[in-house]
Each structure stands twice: as C-alpha cells, then as structure tokens.
Amino acid sequence: MIKAVVGANWGDEGKGKITDMLAKEADIIVRFQGGANAGHTIVNNYGKFALHTLPSGVFYSHTTSVIGNGVALNIPVLIKELNEIVSKGVPAPKIKISDRAQMVMPYHILFDQYEEERLGGKSFGSTNPVSLRSTQINMQKSVSR
C-alpha cells in the first residue's frame, strides 16, 4: 500500500512527525522536495533529533530513505545530520540520493545572507538559500548531476 503525507500550508504542519509514525511500517520513505530551512523534530528511543535534510525513515533499519530530485541538497548539513544520528547509536541508515537532487552551493548561502542584509528591517526571513536555488531551477541554471 502506498501512503503519502502532503502539506498545503508551507510547512509547520507536522508532516515529519506523521511520516515518522508511518515509517515504522514502511519499506521506503521519500523526501521529495524542500531544503535545510525546513525541519522537523523526532523524539525516539535514541534521543531527540532535529532533521533538516534527512527523511524521517532514517531511524528504521528496514526502511530505505530516499532524497528526491526536488530537494535542495546541502551536503554539509546532510553529513552533519548523518554523523549526529550515528553518534547517538542509530544504525547507519540506508539512503539513496537522486542524481537530480539540486545542490546548494556556497554562493547560494552567501547570496541569501547578502540579500537579508540588503533588505535590513524589511527582510523576508531567510530561506537558507532555498529561494535562490528554486529560482535557478526555474531558470534551468541549477547544479545537479
């Protein structure tokens, strides 16, 4: 049986927690979009974790976690999260990453910081380079493969 958890409110709906509950019996969990600006907190037998890049299925050894092509993939954040969960005793997760996942590059982060500084008190709230990365996808100038 296929189950999908989809949000319609730009986040903060509890999708990560619901996905974690469903992951207990899932063979595959797919994170299909979003970036490290989004996050969800999972509390389980291993401890409390704030995930920003990893799919919720990483805590279940029988589950394959997929990072899909719509994800703004920030490699340093991914590595940090992997190291954090493994250091707390979570078995190394089975992860597959789409070869079309969009890479967050250092210039995306710098551009986001400069834009926030330029806007000053009228800033839109950092999206942690997701907005620039999304713009580049729409312009077909993103970095993948």
PLM region spans:
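Non-transmembrane, aqueous-exposed alpha-helical and coiled segments at domain scale
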Residues: M1-R145
